[in-house]
């Protein structure tokens, strides 16, 4: 599984071409994962996630309220 990790506010975690920051963010939540900064979305994106990982989903987006 893969997807956008969420911060405490339910929003995607922002980045600006900083893959190492995103890798740390992903591995803090899911130890075996990897991550990078998705340039077009300016958000961290995680890969190698467990199937039950909770990631940002546009249909259940609670960001900003």
UniProtKB/Swiss-Prot annotation:
Chain coiled-coil ranges: none
InterPro entries xref list: LCN-type_CS_alpha_beta_dom (IPR044062), Scorpion_toxin-like (IPR003614), Scorpion_toxin-like_sf (IPR036574), Scorpion_toxinL (IPR018218), Scorpion_toxinL/defensin (IPR002061)
Q: Which SMART domains match?
A: Knot1
Limits of the LCN-type CS-alpha/beta domain: 1-64
Subcellular compartments: Secreted
Q: Name one GO molecular function term.
A: toxin activity
List the disulfide bonds in this chain. 11-63, 15-37, 22-44, 26-46
What's the record's remark on domains? Has the structural arrangement of an alpha-helix connected to antiparallel beta-sheets by disulfide bonds (CS-alpha/beta).
- Can you name this protein? Putative beta-neurotoxin RjAa8
